[in-house]
């Protein structure tokens, strides 16, 4: 008799994690490996970040924090969002978790009911479908071919949406393609979403600073501020500051969604690492 829950039959180990483990094994065996498996920056965590983490340990900031992160970090996140996007958030609209992946998983857990659909443009980060399935949702994969620069078009989005659609996950800059949406493209997607007022949008912006073009990438809410009450913005420090192992991410969005995420944080990790929060 299997001791695993039946839901475990619907998911597989992350292909990128499996490939990363193999690359690590080969490297430890002396092979020279160019590792393109996971989103790991090729530079080290900045020294000032390391020093802030060490200082937190030395002054004893090693205890539980609030489930949604420290007030100081939430304030810093509000400041960054204001500075970068021009969007103003309140403290109640911010939550900090143990990595952007954890925040996304918790957001889906808090909002999906059995059979709810989540639209995922492809190519996609390999963890999205499994996170949806583990939370009893149904991934709806929408192919976005090279002819469309690997981006979701308004026409393809309209075709994918149904009365069961709960979320659209929009990852830009995209993992794995690096695709970035223009303001006009985002506005076109917003027009489609206007006809489906019950659909929520999760914008995964973890790569927003890993951008080689001119200027910077545009966030959906900058192009479509009217979606403010439907969009959950997810970001973190892993990619921009090479802090993948520090496990710290955050979200910004409507109070009711953030409140639900906080409710789930309490019985799961309790709180993000206080050392990582101080470093961030």
Q: Which role does the model predict for each range below?
A:
Residues 84-88, 194-199, 224-229, 256:
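Short helix-capping segments at alpha-helix termini
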Residues 2-99, 106:
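N-terminal small-domain helix-loop-helix segment of the aminotransferase-like
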Residues 130, 134-140:
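A short helix-loop-beta submotif of the ANL/AMP-binding
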Residues 110-132:
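Conserved PLP-anchoring active-site segment centered on the Schiff-base-forming lysine
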Residues 225-280:
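Conserved core segment of the aminotransferase class I/II
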Residues 88-94, 114-117, 164, 228-231:
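Short acidic capping loops at alpha-helix termini that bridge into adjacent secondary structure
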Residues 140, 144-214:
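Active-site phosphate-binding strand-loop segment of PLP-dependent enzymes
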């Amino acid at each position: 008799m299997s001791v695993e829950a039946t839901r475990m039959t619907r998911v597989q180990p992350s292909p990128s994690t499996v490939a990363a483990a193999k690359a690590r094994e080969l490297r430890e065996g002396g092979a020279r490996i160019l590792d393109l498996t996971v989103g790991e920056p090729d530079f080290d965590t900045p020294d000032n970040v390391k020093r802030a983490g060490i200082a937190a340990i030395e002054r004893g900031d090693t205890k539980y924090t609030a489930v949604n992160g420290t007030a100081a970090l939430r304030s810093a996140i509000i400041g960054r969002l204001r500075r970068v996007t021009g969007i103003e958030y309140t403290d109640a609209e911010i939550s900090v978790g143990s990595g952007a992946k954890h925040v996304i998983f918790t957001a889906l857990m808090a909002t999906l009911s059995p059979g709810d659909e989540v639209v995922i443009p492809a190519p996609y980060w390999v963890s999205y479908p499994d996170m949806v399935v583990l939370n009893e949702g149904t991934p709806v994969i929408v192919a976005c071919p090279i002819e469309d620069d690997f981006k979701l078009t308004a026409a393809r989005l309209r075709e994918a949406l149904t009365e069961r659609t709960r979320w659209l996950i929009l990852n830009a800059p995209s993992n794995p393609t690096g695709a970035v949406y223009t303001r006009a493209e985002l506005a076109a997607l917003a027009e489609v979403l206007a006809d489906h007022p019950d659909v929520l949008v999760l914008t995964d912006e973890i790569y927003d600073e890993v951008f080689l073009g001119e200027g910077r990438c545009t966030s959906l809410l900058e192009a479509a501020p009217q979606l403010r009450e439907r969009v959950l913005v997810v970001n973190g420090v892993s990619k921009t500051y090479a802090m993948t192992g520090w496990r710290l991410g955050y979200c910004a969005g409507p109070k009711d969604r953030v409140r639900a995420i906080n409710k789930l944080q309490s019985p799961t990790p309790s709180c993000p690492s206080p050392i990582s929060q101080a470093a961030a």
